[in-house]
């Protein structure tokens, strides 16, 4: 979220809290009646059924939008127009399919706030023909999904079920992603907008809402338009994306992306030495293998950073050359650890050049996707956030 972070810093915002990552503070939980639960469930299911998966690309100037992403934006826009009809609030859908809402202040001297969620879903799992399955009054046992998959509270994947006994649990049918990241956030914000505008007694400053696109490919900030949110200068920004209910994260991973391309000449293996064969597949695999297992995401706990080589893709080339592209994520809380991870990647690149001299390595510049909000958030704000949540 590089540009958004820049906008936030330039505007001198008080804070940005990401509800997504390990460092959390806890606000008071609330109980809701069956009517509210049913309404929220229906809204979420309707959103989850829309396949709004993004499409990742190494072209950092591109901003791909799939038909489902456009459909999701139009659905949220239509729901909000119905909710806000007859009020002073405004709804705007931009050319980039972001949806913006402004609820004007009805009292003076109250800080402004902006809430955010994203409309897209990760492209890294099957996402077509999503079938949400609603499990009401969960009894604490195994969930048997239509695909044959069993979700058990005794497994790492189902460990959160232990806190859901007696509640409504929603899953996919087991053959696709559900898309709760971030259809949950979208559902929460649309419901919040409904609550605010129906509560005539609530006194508030300007309240803004942003439903962004392509967050899951690290580009939510690329088409963010500050003109729709008071010039980009609300006093507090809260992103609804990920963590457990009532948890507010006040620190998060800094996210950096980079792409490495391995290029070499094609040749028959029997004539590889004389022809200076550049085996790009093996070179790319060698590069990935240079990253210490201790720095793999599966070894990361809490605030430990990691390097994730998450795709390896052949690329069409000409002039008798072949190419393989490896996309890499770096995640870290501490800036010094980030420097250590960069050194590891640089060493891995150098080792490929030594081991496979016929392969050319081309690395794109780093792309800062979003930054740890703790770098710029005043510590005094944590209790303010809790107080606001209550």
Spans of model-derived segments:
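Acidic/His- and Gly-rich active-site-bordering loop/insert found
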Residues: 28-168
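Metal-dependent amide/peptide-bond hydrolase catalytic core
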Residues: 279-390
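C-terminal segment of classical bacterial N-terminal signal peptides
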Residues: 18-26
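A generic structural motif
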Residues: 176, 266-269, 273, 330-338
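Acidic/histidine-rich catalytic neighborhood of metal-dependent amide-processing enzymes
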Residues: 161-253, 299-318, 326-333
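Phosphate/diphosphate-binding glycine-rich loops and adjacent basic-rich segments that engage nucleotide
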Residues: 239-267, 272, 281-282
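Buried hydrophobic packing segments
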Residues: 76, 80, 188-196, 284-288
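Bacterial N-terminal signal peptides that target proteins for export
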Residues: 2-12
């Amino acid at each position: 979220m590089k540009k958004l972070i820049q906008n936030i810093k330039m505007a001198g915002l008080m804070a940005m809290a990401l509800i997504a990552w390990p460092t959390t503070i806890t606000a008071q939980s609330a109980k809701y009646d069956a009517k509210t639960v049913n309404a929220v469930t229906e809204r979420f299911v309707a959103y989850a059924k829309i396949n709004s998966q993004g499409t990742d690309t190494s072209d950092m100037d591109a901003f791909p939008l799939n038909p489902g992403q456009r459909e999701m934006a139009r659905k949220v826009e239509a729901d909000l127009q119905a909710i806000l009809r007859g009020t002073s609030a405004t709804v705007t859908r931009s050319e980039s399919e972001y949806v913006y809402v402004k609820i004007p202040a009805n009292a003076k001297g109250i800080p402004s706030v902006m809430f955010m969620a994203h409309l897209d879903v990760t492209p890294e799992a099957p996402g077509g023909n999503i079938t949400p399955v609603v499990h009401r009054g969960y009894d604490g046992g195994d969930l048997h999904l239509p695909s044959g998959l069993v979700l058990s509270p005794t497994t790492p994947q189902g460990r959160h079920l232990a806190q859901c006994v007696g509640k409504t649990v929603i899953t996919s049918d087991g053959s696709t992603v559900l898309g709760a990241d971030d259809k949950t956030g979208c559902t929460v914000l649309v419901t919040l907008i409904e609550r605010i505008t129906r509560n005539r007694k609530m006194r508030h400053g300007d309240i803004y809402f942003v439903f962004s696109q392509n967050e899951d490919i690290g580009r939510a900030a690329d088409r963010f338009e500050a003109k729709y949110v008071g010039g980009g200068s609300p006093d507090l920004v809260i992103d609804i994306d990920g963590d457990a209910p009532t948890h507010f994260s006040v620190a998060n991973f800094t996210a950096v992306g980079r792409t490495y391309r391995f290029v070499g000449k094609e040749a028959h293996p029997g004539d590889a030495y004389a022809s200076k064969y550049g085996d790009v597949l093996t070179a790319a695999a060698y590069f990935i293998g240079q990253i210490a297992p201790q720095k793999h995401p599966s070894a990361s706990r809490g605030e430990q950073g990691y390097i994730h080589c998450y795709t390896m893709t052949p690329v069409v080339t000409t002039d008798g050359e072949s190419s393989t592209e490896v996309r890499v994520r770096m995640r870290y809380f501490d800036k010094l650890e980030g420097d250590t991870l960069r050194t590891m990647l640089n060493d891995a690149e150098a080792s490929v050049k030594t081991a496979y001299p016929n392969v050319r390595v081309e690395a794109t510049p780093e792309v800062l996707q979003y930054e740890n909000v703790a770098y710029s958030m005043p510590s005094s704000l944590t209790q303010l956030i809790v107080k606001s949540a209550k």
